[in-house]
Amino acid sequence: MKKLEADVVVVGGGPSGLAASVQAAEDGASVILLNKADIVGGAANMGMGPLGIGTRQQQAQMVDISVEKAFKMFMDYTHWRVDANLVKKYFENSKDTIEWLEDMGVEFAGAYKYFPKSEATWHIVAVNGGIGRNGGAIMNKAMMEKGKELGVEYYNSTTVEKIIMKDGKVAGVMAKDATGEEIEVSAKAVIIGTGGAGDNPQVIKERMGYTWGKDMFNFAIPGLKGDGIRMAMEAGAATTDMNIEMIYILPNSDMGPDCIPATFMQPNLMVNKEGRRFINEEEMQNTTFTGNAIAIQPERIGFSILDSSIIKGYKKRGLDVTNFVHHPDNIDDFEQCVDDSIAAKNPDVYKADSIEELANMLGIDPEALEDTIDEYNDMCDSYDEQ
């Protein structure tokens, strides 16, 4: 068995663990970081950047957002079922965090909104001097390089299995490397940054009541089994209710070019399995609100319905709602993308020549769907005439 020692051991090599390891080292501690994956960064490698409030980017862009405003919005949204002190501290420290990352060489393209009605708090990491995907990987690399400069020791492909307790106090961790060799790390403090349990259907079922693949679909980032939560609980940590943020998305993520998901996320008619409209489609730009609405529908399913006239309009003037994740230059090949998706037997995309045919494909009563569409069109005509 290999034995190591440090002032602080960090469990998890995502942005939380990387940031914690750098900060601890800057404060003068010797640090060992143990990471289950073979590379650092975690799911954030697919991300584009963190939140910031009161930053110079926002000031330059004349963004009117303050810690107090953001805090009220967040607490209103969560109905105060979160740790208010933690949320406030997170927002208060976000400006310094952005500057801290900049000191490591991270460049930000600016502060942006995720969707039109949101606030411009999303600080997107510059990729080749502009906006691109996976800027989070650049940020994570910068933190790791800074950590190495400060003497942080990184151990990838190393799974922590247990927190060592002595006389009621944390004394380190037990882990195994890729070869199966046990590693004992003695430390004065253990920082857990292992993320959630999205890749653990059992935890999701037991703690939240959802059956994965049936009434709930998630990203299920490989390796997010809830190990850190389990180890903390075994060590005697206090617990709270486990929550999950619901968003809406097509169950099959292999949707081809961006034009398909981006087009189906537009505020067009959405119906449930009964053929009934159940949401103000303007809210579709907020994936969480829409996810909440879909979650209480029969079979937790919603269908977004488009016709050729809508597609023609999008081709002429562009999409109504865009974001930096799904932002195709145009949707000129939309029909071909749909045909290709259907030919590939994608179970979540349908195409029909009539409302009745579509209803039968979706398992909806044709008369009910016809009535809903007629009512929807009447309301659109009434608005256009005003």
Question: Which residue ranges define each predicted feature?
Answer:
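Glycine-rich FAD pyrophosphate-binding loop
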Residues: 26-46
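Conserved Rossmann-like nucleotide-cofactor binding loop
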Residues: 16, 39, 276
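Glycine-rich loop(s) and the adjacent beta-strand/alpha-helix scaffold that form part
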Residues: 178-181, 185-252
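N-terminal Rossmann-like FAD-binding beta1-loop-alpha1 element of flavoenzymes
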Residues: 8-33
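Conserved redox-cofactor binding core of oxidoreductases
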Residues: 40, 92-183, 200-204, 379-386
